[in-house]
């Protein structure tokens, strides 16, 4: 299967909200972010996407809905794809992300394409997992650009589990 980890579109930044606080969950995407997501939706309209899974954060959900305009799928929300919570350890973030990925691998077939709309820190966690980088608060977070896709292929559960 192909799992496409997708960073949400450009968002309105709430400069008064601290990282990992509930206020950050409501950041909406900008007009530019909407246009970015629309262009991506157009590009993906002929791709046979089996499922779209998103963080429930507003910016992620909005991005997923725009991508879904040609597919008309039920969008699933999974809190394990939320960004790091206030004072959350890197190990905890990685553990919940990988648990979500493992569930996806169990649920879908080898030829399925799954879109996961998430935040940049989750993409960083997956990159660390993939390249066997020990999770640590000292590992620098990668800065994912808006709508940065990370595509990986998994042959059912044997590759991951």
What is the meaning of each model-derived region?
Residues 81-92:
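Short alpha-helix plus adjacent loop in nuclease-associated cores
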Residues 2-77, 84, 146:
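Active-site-proximal alpha-helix that buttresses catalytic centers in soluble enzyme cores
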Residues 3, 110-121:
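Generic beta-sheet signal
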Residues 11, 122-123:
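Short active-site segment of divalent metal-dependent hydrolases/proteases
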Residues 66, 125-129:
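Active-site signature of alpha/beta-hydrolase-fold catalytic machinery across serine-
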């Amino acid at each position: 299967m192909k799992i496409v980890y997708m960073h949400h579109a450009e968002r309105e930044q709430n400069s008064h909200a601290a990282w990992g606080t509930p206020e950050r969950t409501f950041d909406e995407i900008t007009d530019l972010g909407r246009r970015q997501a629309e262009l991506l939706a157009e590009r993906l309209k002929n791709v046979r996407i089996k499922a779209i899974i998103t963080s429930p954060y507003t910016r992620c959900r909005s991005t997923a809905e725009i991508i879904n305009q040609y597919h008309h799928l039920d969008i699933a929300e999974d809190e394990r794809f939320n960004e790091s919570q206030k004072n959350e350890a890197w190990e905890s973030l990685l553990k919940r992300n990988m648990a979500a990925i493992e569930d996806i691998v169990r649920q879908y077939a080898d030829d399925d394409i799954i879109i996961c709309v998430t935040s940049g820190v989750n993409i960083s966690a997956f990159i660390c997992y993939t390249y066997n980088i020990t999770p640590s608060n000292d590992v620098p977070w990668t800065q994912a650009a808006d709508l940065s896709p990370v595509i990986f292929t998994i042959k059912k559960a044997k590759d991951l589990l």
